[in-house]
């Protein structure tokens, strides 16, 4: 026992006299550890919160220490161990805004220039047509409800404008004006990340001219609006997510039941079935065959866009399968609590935060004496200055691809693409949906 005391003199031992087993996480088998000084011992991890690790020694005692007192290899092990631990996922039942609290103000109106600017708490949107008060409040409510939804879902998005105080949008009076303003051919709306702008023609959301102002018509719908706003809310995530996650999350939010400014997340299954019925009744191709996962998971943005341009049938498959995957990981996989999805976004989020820090370091670097920023955005600097380094995961296109492949393993959870697809088909069959 004296040798044990010498060996672990730097650890603080906590002897648990009576601890309910149900309160503790599953203890893993013992493994070999080393202190920072190189002393070896055997123990199992009981818990690690990122600051303090609790170990179970071979004699049953519990010991607490900080990672810095362990070897570099053991510190790396703890980081990976923590990533694998369950997250307490809180799935919201209903998310929305109180209509009475909605701020929807007129900033400016210019009938000659067809430019009407409106502002809500988090959005500023420019319309080519004047909105009546009912439509203005409805649009404002849906914009703000989408913001609240992205805050509440267990993805840790933390939506904020790409720049400035407000998310920006442009609404066009018809498709011709939409295309002339930079809209995407064949689309019902688009979020252009380079311009930080959501663009949509009135017809895509069911708005028509009534007298001298625009109002809702019988086809008023929110799917396109919510889909593209989701992209806008996730502006700072899009560079770190594969395209199937980018589009799948937007399809998922766009299908959630939305009534009077409230998304019913608990009724996501109703949205799923409505989506399937829409495909059956209102599209010529019907319900698409799922896109092969072994092709979908590694697809690049360039390859995705090539499919959209050249193959309408495969395009439908891409969006449909992306939605199926996100819905599955949110509601059907394992216990149906979105656990793997939350862990996936936590891992991606850690790198995104590192990239955000790098971006700020670069901004500060460019302000230093000896750095010259050119009109095209490029810059030169003196050789005695040290350029900030980006996170290794995003340093090169190859590193980014490797990072996406690594984080995919969180969702696969030891399954092959074929095994996952088999489980997906089985889960949807139980809902009455045959794929």
Model-derived regions: residue spans:
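N-terminal secretory signal peptides that target proteins for export/translocation
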Residues: 1-7
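Short, flexible beta-strand-to-coil junctions
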Residues: 58, 171-176, 330-334
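Juxtacatalytic substrate-recognition/specificity segment
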Residues: 112-243, 259
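Acidic/His/Gly-enriched intrinsically disordered linker/tail segments
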Residues: 190-202, 220, 240-435
């Amino acid at each position: 026992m004296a040798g044990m005391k010498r060996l672990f003199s730097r650890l603080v031992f906590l002897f648990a006299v009576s601890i309910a087993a149900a309160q503790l996480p599953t203890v893993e088998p013992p493994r070999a550890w080393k202190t920072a000084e190189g002393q070896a011992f055997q123990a199992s991890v009981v818990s690690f919160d990122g600051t303090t690790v609790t170990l179970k020694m071979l004699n049953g005692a519990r010991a607490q220490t900080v990672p810095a007192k362990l070897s570099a290899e053991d510190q790396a092990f703890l980081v990976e161990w923590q990533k694998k631990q369950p997250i307490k996922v809180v799935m919201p039942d209903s998310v929305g805004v109180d209509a009475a609290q909605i701020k929807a103000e007129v900033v400016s109106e210019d009938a000659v220039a067809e430019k009407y600017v409106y502002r809500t708490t988090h959005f500023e949107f420019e319309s080519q047509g004047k909105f009546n008060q009912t439509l203005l409040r409805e649009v404002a409510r849906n914009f703000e409800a989408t913001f609240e939804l992205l805050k509440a879902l267990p993805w840790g998005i933390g939506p904020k404008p790409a720049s400035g105080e407000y998310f920006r949008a442009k609404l066009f009076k018809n498709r011709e004006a939409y295309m002339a303003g930079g809209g995407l051919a064949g689309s019902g709306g688009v979020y252009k990340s380079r311009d930080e702008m959501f663009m949509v023609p009135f017809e895509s959301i069911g708005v028509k001219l009534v007298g001298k102002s625009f109002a809702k018509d019988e086809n008023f719908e929110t799917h396109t609006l919510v889909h593209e706003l989701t992209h806008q809310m996730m502006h700072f995530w899009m560079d770190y997510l594969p395209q199937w996650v980018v589009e799948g999350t937007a399809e998922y939010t766009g299908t959630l039941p939305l009534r009077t400014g409230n998304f019913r997340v608990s009724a996501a299954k109703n949205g799923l079935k409505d989506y399937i019925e829409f495909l059956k009744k209102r599209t010529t191709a019907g319900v698409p065959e799922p896109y092969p996962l072994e092709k979908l998971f590694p697809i690049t943005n360039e390859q995705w866009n090539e499919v959209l341009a050249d193959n309408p049938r495969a395009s439908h498959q891409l969006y449909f399968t992306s939605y199926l995957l996100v819905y599955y990981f949110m509601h059907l996989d394992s216990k149906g609590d979105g656990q793997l999805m939350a862990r996936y976004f936590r891992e991606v989020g850690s790198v995104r935060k590192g990239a955000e820090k790098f971006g700020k370091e670069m901004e500060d670097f460019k302000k230093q004496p000896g750095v010259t920023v050119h009109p095209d955005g490029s810059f030169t600097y003196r050789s005695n200055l040290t350029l900030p380094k980006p996170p290794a995961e995003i340093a090169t296109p190859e590193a980014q691809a490797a990072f996406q492949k690594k984080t995919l393993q969180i969702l696969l959870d030891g399954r092959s693409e074929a095994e996952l697809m088999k489980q997906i088909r089985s889960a949807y069959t139980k809902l009455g949906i045959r794929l």
